[in-house]
């Protein structure tokens, strides 16, 4: 095999169809776009239109709703906590709460509160204050000799002003 003998596989580089180049090309005049009108112009795609067939988003039933009172909790796993303690970002002797987690960089923000999840292993004895925790997370913390305190959900600033 020589460098000047290397060639592409047959059909790997397909020739581009040049449209609008005369009636003899088979793609002249309307260039395969049908007649005139909106769809013959460039940059036109009617979102969700399926050629008159009932579109999928109308064939399927409506379902659910968006709860405006939904509280999104930031999630943190036990292994992330242990890594932060090992790296001396978190003080295991002090109470670990949302503020401490944000300050140490474990979480970026804890707007609605913090939920503790049970992935990983916790070796340090810690006191944790969170807004939610899984059973496995609570068991793992208590097994390591620590404690978990579940706080009441955070109130919105708007709700606090109203009352």
UniProtKB/Swiss-Prot annotation:
Which processes are annotated in GO (biological process)? translation
Q: Which UniProt keywords apply?
A: Ribonucleoprotein, Ribosomal protein, RNA-binding, rRNA-binding
SUPFAM superfamilies referenced in this protein's UniProt entry, alphabetically: Ribosomal proteins L15p and L18e
Q: Where is this region: Disordered?
A: 1-43
Stored InterPro entries: Ribosomal_uL15 (IPR030878), Ribosomal_uL15/eL18 (IPR021131), Ribosomal_uL15/eL18_sf (IPR036227), Ribosomal_uL15_bac-type (IPR005749), Ribosomal_uL15_CS (IPR001196)
Keyword Kinase appears in the UniProt entry? no
GO CC, any one term: cytosolic large ribosomal subunit
Highest taxon listed in the record's lineage: Bacteria
- Amino acid composition bias (Gly residues), ranges on this chain: 21-37
A Pfam family of the record is Ribosomal_L27A
- What cystine pairs are annotated? none
Q: Please name the Gene3D superfamilies in this protein's record.
A: 3.100.10.10
Respond yes or no to whether keyword Phosphoprotein is given for this record: no
Residues in a coiled coil are none
Tell me, what is one Gene Ontology molecular-function annotation carried by this entry?
structural constituent of ribosome
List, alphabetically, the PANTHER family matched: 50S RIBOSOMAL PROTEIN L15, LARGE RIBOSOMAL SUBUNIT PROTEIN UL15M
Q: How does it assemble?
A: Part of the 50S ribosomal subunit.
Function description? Binds to the 23S rRNA.
Family, per entry: Belongs to the universal ribosomal protein uL15 family.
Entry protein name? Large ribosomal subunit protein uL15
